[in-house]
From Swiss-Prot:
The lineage of its organism: Bacteria, Pseudomonadati, Pseudomonadota, Gammaproteobacteria, Enterobacterales. Homodimer. This is Orotidine 5'-phosphate decarboxylase. The active site is at K68 (proton donor). Substrate binds at residues 17, 39, 66-75, 125, 186, 195, 215-216. Its EC number is 4.1.1.23. It comes from the Bacteria. It catalyses: orotidine 5'-phosphate + H(+) = UMP + CO2. Keywords: Decarboxylase, Lyase, Pyrimidine biosynthesis. Signal peptide: none annotated. It comes from Buchnera aphidicola subsp. Acyrthosiphon pisum (strain APS). The gene is pyrF. Belongs to the OMP decarboxylase family. Type 1 subfamily.
Length: 236
């Protein structure tokens, strides 16, 4: 299997979206930690907690703790510090939490010699434009994502989570150092599930996305390694 970390293509983060440890470890034991990153979201973290994060870290994996912190600045400061203590590689907060919250999260990492990347979530891939209007925001989804991207960049964050179609413009505006993480990656035969803003792995490469997050396409596959190989080859 080609290593996307060596070649000029998006790196792959596997979302461990399982309801139990046994199922998660069945997949983890097939993966090479020098090739793949792992994402732990709210479901797995709620079920298995900090201990599971540490176990995966000890196996040599870089962990993206995707808890999307969104609270008052002091709470986010303390939560960010606690998360960084786990030795994670990347952590997410919600960009819509505002300037003060984002700056507090960034400040929480100052004392760490090797701080995790701090990433802001702009719009979920399940998000539709009508949803903005429902909460009183009368701009397009693209404008909304760009505004939150600028806010996060101004606050010193390392990058954003955003749908793939906005990535190219964000790279142009903020440069290559500003990391883009994109979920909603599907190859042609995959089901959409509950995601609307999706792109293919090949498009992710074209848009200069740094990391792609792949969940159900892999976790629900009968042959996840074969599927991953297919995804990597599609980006060549």
């Amino acid at each position: 299997m080609l290593n996307p970390n060596i070649f000029h293509m998006p790196k792959i983060i596997i979302a461990l979206d399982f309801c139990n440890k046994k199922s998660a470890m069945k997949l983890v034991n097939l993966l090479n930690p020098s090739i793949f990153y792992l994402k732990i979201g709210k479901e797995m973290f709620t079920i298995l907690g900090c201990k599971f994060v540490k176990e995966l870290h000890q196996l040599g994996f870089n962990i993206f703790l995707d808890l999307k912190f969104h609270d008052i600045p002091n709470t986010v400061f303390n939560a960010t510090k606690a998360a960084a203590d786990l030795g994670i590689w990347m952590l997410s907060v919600h960009a819509s939490g505002g300037k003060e919250m984002l700056i507090s999260a960034k400040k929480a990492l100052k004392s760490f010699k090797k701080a995790p990347l701090l990433i802001a979530v702009t719009a979920l891939t399940s998000f539709k434009e009508e949803a903005l209007k429902e909460i009183g925001i009368n701009i397009s989804l693209t404008e909304y994502i760009l505004k939150l991207s600028k806010l996060s960049n101004d606050c010193g964050l390392d990058g954003i989570v955003c749908p793939g179609k906005e990535a190219k413009k964000i790279k142009f505006l903020f440069g290559n150092k500003y990391k883009i993480i994109t979920p909603g990656i599907r190859i042609a035969k995959d089901l959409l599930y509950d995601q609307n803003n999706i792109i293919t792995p090949k498009e992710a490469k074209e848009y200069k996305i740094d990391y792609i997050v792949i969940g159900r396409s892999i976790t629900m596959s009968k042959n996840p390694i074969k599927k991953l190989d297919l995804i990597i080859k599609s980006m060549q």
